UniProtKB/Swiss-Prot annotation:
This is Rano class II histocompatibility antigen, B-1 beta chain. It comes from the Eukaryota. Keywords: Adaptive immunity, Disulfide bond, Glycoprotein, Immunity, Isopeptide bond, Membrane, MHC II, Signal, Transmembrane, Transmembrane helix, Ubl conjugation. It is found in: Membrane. Glycans are attached at residue 46. Residues 28-224 are extracellular. Its main location: membrane. Residues 215-224 are annotated as: Connecting peptide. GO terms for cellular component: cell surface; early endosome; external side of plasma membrane; Golgi apparatus; late endosome membrane; lysosomal membrane; membrane; MHC class II protein complex.
Length: 263
């Protein structure tokens, strides 16, 4: 499947040359070199769920004409672009609108498109508390969302099942060296005993949203929990050591020693 390009580049160049060679332009000062540029841009959101086609025409570093599929027609940006806009809207508008599928969608789904366009990396999500203080003190919960691709992502905070919008602060998207992204979304809060906070993440790579939970509890409760975990770990270690010693003893010699050793 070959990559497709817009089929009216030559007519566009002809229109520009006709305008530049018209009698009204002969007496004007003009540069010796003429640079004509065409840029066809396809923007994709969630794969091909939403596609936007933008076509830009540039003469000597000044954009004079643009087609945007969200607008649906050619628009002149300078006087130079007016004849082209009128001509293209009469002669090529339906063809241009169709190229949203025949060019943009076709090229996305074609075998030559690099896998980076379809790359999906699931985000890693973690919650941390900025300051380890007791309950009923102002604090900041930080939801770290890392290593995801593409860039489109939605991160929300919930407290006891209700979405929190006040006190939510987010960083800009941070680019990693491997083309993935990360972002920090913080929630200003004053934790009360028993409250449950959830960081809720939506991303194109996920079949369902990722949620990470943080529970507000007192320092004594945290200490008891850590003590319980520590006691459990020590118990497992001592149990394993006891079983190991017993196993070694069971493998030892059984019955009386050889007669020669008793003399």
């Amino acid at each position: 499947m070959a990559l497709q390009t817009p089929s009216f580049l030559l007519p566009a160049a002809v229109v520009v040359l006709m305008v530049l060679s018209s009698p009204g332009t002969e007496g004007r000062d003009s540069p010796r070199d003429f640079v004509y540029q065409f840029k066809g841009l396809c923007y994709y959101t969630n794969g091909t769920q939403r596609i936007r086609d933008v076509i830009r025409y540039i003469y000597n570093q000044e954009e004079y004409l643009r087609y945007d599929s969200d607008v649906g027609e050619y628009r002149a940006l300078t006087e130079l672009g007016r004849p082209s806009a009128e001509y293209f809207n009469k002669q090529y508008l339906e063809q241009t609108r169709a190229e949203l599928d025949t060019v943009c969608r076709h090229n996305y789904e074609g075998s030559e498109v690099r896998t980076s366009l379809r790359r999906l990396e699931q985000p890693n999500v973690a919650i941390s508390l900025s300051r380890t203080e007791a309950l009923n003190h102002h604090n900041l919960l930080v939801c770290s969302v890392t290593d995801f691709y593409p860039a489109q992502i939605k991160v929300r905070w919930f407290r006891n099942g209700q979405e929190e919008t006040a006190g939510v602060v987010s960083t800009q998207l941070i680019r990693n060296g491997d083309w993935t992204f990360q972002i920090l979304v913080m929630l200003e809060m004053t934790p009360q005993r028993g409250e449950v906070y959830i960081c809720h993440v939506d991303h194109p790579s996920l079949e369902s949203p990722v949620t990470v939970e943080w529970r507000a509890q007192s320092e004594s409760a945290q200490s008891k929990m850590l003590s319980g975990i520590g006691g459990f770990v020590l118990g497992v270690i001592f149990l394993g050591l006891g079983l190991f010693i017993r196993h070694k003893r069971q493998k030892g010699p059984r019955g009386p020693p050889p007669a020669g050793l008793l003399q």
